[in-house]
Amino acid sequence: MEHIHDINFQEFSKDPIGTIDRFRWKNEVTPFSNILFPIVCSFGYLALIYGLQIFMKNKKEIKLHGFAMFHNLFLCLLSLLMFLGIVIPMAKYSFPHGLYNIICKPIDSGLVQFSYYIFYLSKVYEFIDTIIQVLRKKSLLFLHVWHHFITLWLVWANLKYDTGCQWVDISANCFVHIVMYFYYFQTERGINPWWKKHITTCQIIQFIVDMSSHLAWHFYDTQGNHNSNYCSGTWATSAFSDFVILSFLGLFIQFFVKAYKKKSSIKKKTN
């Protein structure tokens, strides 16, 4: 089957399923695969949010309830579609191929790769999370800005160098985002679900799962005695991923302790 590396919207409208089935990321050919895209978007993101903070300094907050409700519901549903687009094919693939292949030589085309690609583009759309916070004049945590800035680079690098275990990272992130954006959607409706704290717990578990998959990748890649000798991807990309994931893990644990553990200790003292 001949792969396609570009999304021709005319062809896509005529045969969306066939287009997705034949899709495969190709460096410098697939739209926005060039390194200029993450450079412009990530540094443009920093310039925009800090410029907006200066602009909003002496202005009243902008509520944005209607837009924020749509934004969060859209990302919740998109995350669900991407999650299913990766997990269902990978589950079918895993039974005959085993653990080594799903970590080192997973599906590299079709719905899984198309879902990766949409996930990559969605990281730019998610910059709107920060824009909403700035327009509402809420303080920005380093964790928030770092997460949005570096995740685009993380996804781009893993797509470019085709890291075998990236499906674990992406599907885990999609699952967490289903829960997280549904929570934010509910809060925009005036409902405050009781399980807010557990979102951070899920995020911490996500990074532990991510690191486990990368450790498995490193283990298999050092063996050199499998079907194709080595895992798909590079050590440099995996090391970069390890650094980013560990930074997220540390920052989210720090946030959890500050936001929830200290609050519970204060409550105990007042009681």
UniProtKB/Swiss-Prot annotation:
Keywords assigned: Fatty acid biosynthesis, Fatty acid metabolism, Lipid biosynthesis, Lipid metabolism, Membrane, Transferase, Transmembrane, Transmembrane helix
GO process annotations (BP): fatty acid elongation, monounsaturated fatty acid; fatty acid elongation, polyunsaturated fatty acid; fatty acid elongation, saturated fatty acid; sphingolipid biosynthetic process; very long-chain fatty acid biosynthetic process
Record's catalysed reaction(s): a very-long-chain acyl-CoA + malonyl-CoA + H(+) = a very-long-chain 3-oxoacyl-CoA + CO2 + CoA
Induction: Down-regulated by Pseudomonas aeruginosa, PAO1 strain and PA14 strain infection.
Location relative to the cell: Membrane
Membrane topology: Multi-pass membrane protein
Protein name: Fatty acid elongase A
Organism: Dictyostelium discoideum
